[in-house]
Amino acid sequence: SDEVNLKKAYVGVTNVLESNPNAYIWAGRDFHQRPQQGINDYFWMNHDGQGAGVKNFDIGGVQFDVAAVSQVKSCSPEVMADETNPSRITCTGSSDTGDNGHYALTTKTHNIKAGPIDVEVYANYGFDSKAVDSDARLEAWQGGLVLSHTNDSGVNKVILRYSDNSDNSVYNKTDDLTTVYASFEGSHKFTQQAQVEYLLAFHDYDNG
């Protein structure tokens, strides 16, 4: 099959919907829904792939992101015994042009204020197509909540995530797996030259 060495290739437009001019409509391959923490370098959600969606769709000041994406098919290079092949490798290790049968519907609700607290809510659903063997197909659910507070000295943030049949991505499914992730992180600036960052995290797996 063909291979493509592009991690990102997409188009996006605004000012398409008269009632929602700031809504950003996109389609293609992108680093999708991958919120990352700094100290532990952890993507607590990750749905990179190809698909389409809309971001910043405004309803009464609250903004919504919705997308349907698929996980990109990739190849792990292996040396072949067939010496008639000049390169003697199965592939270059880049991504395929198609998907591997794992799909996700992702949502994010943001620009919510609860007093001084900024609120973000995530809800994702994962499923498989016929490209996956029927006895291996699974569904997965995932919900997330982010509460953050910013002031002149820094920011504090609480992240909560619950996943059913998955961990940080509903692409990658494991039957009867339940995971919970919770963290508290932030930063405090003492002076222009001195700042401290901190993070406390809890990650629980229940594969029962």
Which residues make up each language-model segment?
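Internal metal/ion-chelating core segments
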Residues: 64-69, 73-152
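Short acidic, gly/pro-rich beta-turn/loop elements at beta-sheet edges
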Residues: 21, 35-37, 64, 76, ...
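Outer membrane beta-barrel
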Residues: 1-80, 102-113, 118-120
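Detector for outer-membrane/organellar transmembrane beta-barrel domains
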Residues: 105, 113-128, 136-208
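Residue-identity detector for glycine
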Residues: 12, 28, 38, 49-53, ...
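Arginine residue identity/basic-tract feature
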Residues: 7-8, 29, 34, 88, ...
